[in-house]
């Protein structure tokens, strides 16, 4: 039975597996000096901008840590939503590796706004205080909501006026682009993002991310920071070749659009049920909702999913590129049975 706990629980797309098998047929130079990585870099530059610098890394936490090290110095602070992955779910790795203070901002929907962050833009030049160095935003957010381009531009313009950078955690950026009908470039480069953690494991890849640097000022030390952060793979082609498959014939878009559609199908079946209340707009492939506790307890006997706020009986469902309509129908059938 399929899990609705996380898109990390999904499998690997067959076309990505084919790419891995092709990369495995012969020897190749290590550490990224291979034809597979060369092609992946070309595809990323084609999708984003010709002058970006992609660095392939092992995972999301490593990607965020590398990106934030490039954006900051140890006396800086990183401003993020209180639900941010770097603040809640990365065991303090970004704080430890950057030396920075992570400053969480209370938000109703997981999004930063200029109004919310302005109180944190203070004490510039005062030696007793951490100096604001970067905004960290997630696209999609940890609450499944999606930033519109104008919302991102408002943050990047504010940051740049204060000599700061903006790092986007794009673990689910494909779902956001699919939801908004935008290209990767329109959602990042054109909005003024300085550096992106470009993920794919939630959308059909096996492992790995790419730190994509857009701001030229951040490129010079990038390869050294990646190596020192233990994020340089010797057989790097097994990370990079997946991105070639991902960016060929819009595989990323097909996968993300499907996951989003499955979330909307689940939402349509749940919204009218007694005792069900949605806590956030369903804009991507994540659903946050409350149900009566007996319904949740019974459902947990058959399905794997997470509590988001156990005191409030709030749970999270996540759909994936390989979620089927039958999976949704079976889940809805079980919920209806327990709701009545």
Which residues fall in each region the model found?
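Conserved PLP-enzyme active-site core in the AAT-like
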Residues: 2-290, 294-302, 308-323, 327, ...
């Amino acid at each position: 039975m399929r899990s609705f706990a996380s898109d990390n629980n999904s499998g690997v797309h067959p076309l990505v597996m084919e790419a891995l098998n092709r990369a495995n047929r012969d020897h190749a130079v290590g550490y990224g000096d291979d034809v597979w990585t060369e092609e992946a870099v070309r595809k990323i530059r084609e999708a984003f901008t010709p002058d970006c610098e992609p660095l392939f890394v092992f995972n999301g936490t490593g990607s965020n840590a590398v990106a934030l090290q490039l954006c900051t110095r140890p006396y800086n602070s990183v401003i993020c939503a209180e639900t941010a992955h770097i603040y809640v779910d990365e065991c303090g790795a970004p704080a430890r590796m950057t030396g920075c203070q992570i400053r969480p901002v209370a938000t109703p929907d997981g999004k930063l706004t200029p109004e919310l962050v302005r109180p944190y833009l203070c004490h510039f030049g005062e030696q007793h205080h951490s100096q604001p160095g970067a905004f960290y935003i997630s696209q999609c957010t940890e609450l499944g909501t999606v930033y519109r381009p104008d919302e991102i531009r408002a943050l990047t313009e504010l940051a740049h006026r204060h000599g700061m950078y903006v790092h986007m955690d794009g673990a689910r950026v494909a779902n956001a682009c699919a939801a908004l009908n935008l290209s990767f470039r329109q959602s990042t480069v054109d909005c003024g993002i300085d550096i992106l953690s470009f993920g794919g494991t939630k959308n059909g890849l096996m492992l790995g991310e790419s730190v994509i640097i857009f701001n030229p000022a951040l490129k010079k030390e990038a390869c050294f920071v990646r190596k020192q952060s233990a994020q340089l793979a010797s057989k790097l082609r097994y990370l990079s070749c997946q991105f070639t498959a991902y960016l060929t014939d819009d595989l990323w878009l097909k996968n993300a659009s499907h996951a989003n559609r499955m979330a909307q199908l689940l939402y349509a079946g749940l919204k009218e049920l007694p005792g069900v209340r949605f806590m956030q707009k369903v804009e991507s492939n994540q659903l946050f909702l409350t149900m009566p506790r007996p319904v949740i307890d019974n459902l947990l006997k058959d399905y794997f999913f997470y509590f988001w706020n156990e005191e409030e009986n709030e749970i999270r469902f996540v759909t994936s590129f390989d979620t089927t309509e039958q999976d949704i129908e079976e889940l809805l059938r079980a919920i209806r049975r327990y709701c009545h």
